[in-house]
Design a protein with these regions (language model features):
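Low-complexity, intrinsically disordered export/secretion signals at extreme N-termini
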Residues: 2-72
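N-terminal pre-domains immediately preceding structured catalytic cores
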Residues: 45-46, 50, 56-105
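Active-site-adjacent loop/helix surface patches within enzyme catalytic domains
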Residues: 80-303
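Acidic/histidine-rich, metal-coordinating catalytic segments
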Residues: 304-319
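Short, low-complexity, polybasic intrinsically disordered segments
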Residues: 317-329
Length: 329
């Protein structure tokens, strides 16, 4: 979740994955570079190793998503949700290894009688512990689940309760290019509060899922301001990025599909040119595996179509790299 373009579990007063964009041919400085010619000699071994060790892209998952045809997940849910709205399953923990309870009453709000969608976030915090600390603050906001970098899933709020994890809604018809002429004119006024209010009055399916009817899933991951980046391309058509942050960190992104790479270049530009705009680190393989399992189970439990699962920046105005590398299909 983001504030001023950066995700934050501690402050979400105006709590966006960019919609899937067409894939223009990148040009100029942002064009992908061959793996054999990194621009900085000191990083050549790192970039070469990234290309050599690259795992194949997630084409199989994309095919599975197409086969699913946006329908509700089939089969029975394994979650076994109790009367408190807590999941009783060995893969979903209610305590940390140190014995700390993860259900955080201070982020729970009113009763949530119906679940219509899932929203995927990144925390902009370095650990489970720091996220739980923020959830313990007075007036804290947060999501229902938290997935650590090693793939461990924690439940942090009752599934019977709303949490403030979405923020102001973006116009769904604007992103799907289906607005009426009147609504197109209203959206051009750039009034996020008014836009969100109009959206909230629409029926399910005509608007994005909101705080009132969605489950939030957070992935532990930091966001950093980009200073520069290099790219390599793999034989399978995927891309690797090496981003240098303004505080000297090196962030690696491996096996990004062509469309994600295009969007990542856009996010890097934004981070370089705008204050308080950062790029989120790549979601880990373990997190994505757990995310796929959890979203499948939740979709089965609540009969949620695949078309109602979104990364946070799609539904609200957030940094576009938040959950950009998340894989739930």
């Amino acid at each position: 979740m983001a504030m001023n373009g950066i995700s934050s579990t501690a402050s979400r007063s105006s709590l966006q994955s960019l919609p899937d964009a067409p894939q223009p041919q990148p040009t100029g400085a942002d064009s992908p570079q061959p793996a054999s010619s990194p621009s900085t000699p000191g990083n050549s071994q790192t970039l070469t190793r990234m290309a050599r060790d690259a795992r194949p892209p997630l084409a199989g998952q994309q095919q599975a998503a197409a086969a699913n045809a946006k329908g509700a997940a089939t089969g029975a849910s394994q979650l076994n949700i109790d009367d408190k709205g807590h999941v009783q399953h060995e893969r979903v923990l209610l305590k940390t290894a140190a014995g700390r309870e993860t259900i955080s009453p201070k982020i729970e709000r009113m009763e949530m009688p119906k679940v219509n969608g899932l929203i995927i976030h990144q925390t902009n915090s370095p650990s489970v512990s720091s996220t739980l600390n923020s959830y313990a603050l007075k007036g804290a906001n947060g999501a229902h689940f938290l997935i650590d970098k090693d793939g461990t899933i924690y439940q942090t709020a009752s599934l019977k309760r709303k949490t403030n994890h979405v923020g102001r809604l973006r116009s769904r018809c604007a992103q799907e290019e289906s607005c009426s002429p009147q609504e197109m004119k209203l959206n051009q006024k750039h009034d996020p509060e008014g836009e969100s209010l109009r959206e909230s009055k629409k029926p399910v399916g005509d608007r994005f899922p909101s705080n009132s009817d969605s489950i939030g899933i957070e992935l532990v991951g930091m966001a950093y301001k980009a200073k520069s980046h290099q790219e390599t391309s793999n034989l399978d058509g995927s891309f690797n990025f090496l981003i240098t942050t303004t505080d000297g960190k090196m962030l690696k992104y491996e096996n990004l599909s062509a469309d994600v790479a295009i969007r990542m270049r856009e996010e890097i530009k934004e981070s370089k040119n705008k204050d308080n705009y950062s790029v989120f680190e790549q979601v880990t393989l373990q997190q994505n595996e757990s995310l796929r399992w959890l979203t499948q189970q939740l979709r089965r439990e609540y009969s949620i179509p695949e078309s109602e699962v979104f990364a946070h920046p799609t539904v609200s105005r957030k940094a576009g790299s938040e959950a950009l590398t998340a894989q739930w299909r």
